[in-house]
Amino acid sequence: MLDLFADAEPWQEPLAAGPVILHRFAFNAAEQLIRDINDVASQSPFRQMVTPGGYTMSVAMTNCGHLGWTTNRQGYLYSPIDPQTNKPWPAMPQSFHNLCQRAATAAGYPDFQPDACLINRYAPGAKLSLHQDKDEPDLRAPIVSVSLGLPAIFQFGGLKRNDPLKRLLLEHGDVVVWGGESRLFYHGIQPLKAGFHPLTADCRYNLTFRQAGKKE
């Protein structure tokens, strides 16, 4: 499918209580980002993690950076070691780091120092249930989330799971940044609809940057 808006300029969409959508912010960097995703996955392959309750997640995941988000029978945690390879997670590519810092600065977080990037791969039908990002030691640091490939519906709620949800269309190259009052808001991705994108074929990638260790 051709992108009819390939020449459109990036633009910001501030939302209530802190989140900002940076539309098309990652568009020009997308090809390099996807090459680097493939390089990371060649070292730490995508896998469908199993939650502590025994549920196999529909989204395939891997990590890069000093710390990687993973699961075990005790819960969710960050670890410097990939439990599948028993090696350190791949280093965060420079393209990832540069984009993340530019996006964080554009959204008002110039001091953000990401040390973890969770890479999610969505096939048609894959989803991410409502959840809070609360496994990080310093919740003052924001979340930076990059969308690549097929479009998806991003659900963004409040501090309670049953708070009303905003449903926002995220397209190729969009970046969402949230922190402050909204840092612990529930969020998720609705089941991905089938489609085709010239850079990612039948899937969507998401890069989620966090500060998972203590800031030096």
Residue locations for each model-derived region?
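Non-heme Fe(II) oxygenase metal-center motifs and adjacent flexible, charged/small-residue loops
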Residues: 1-216
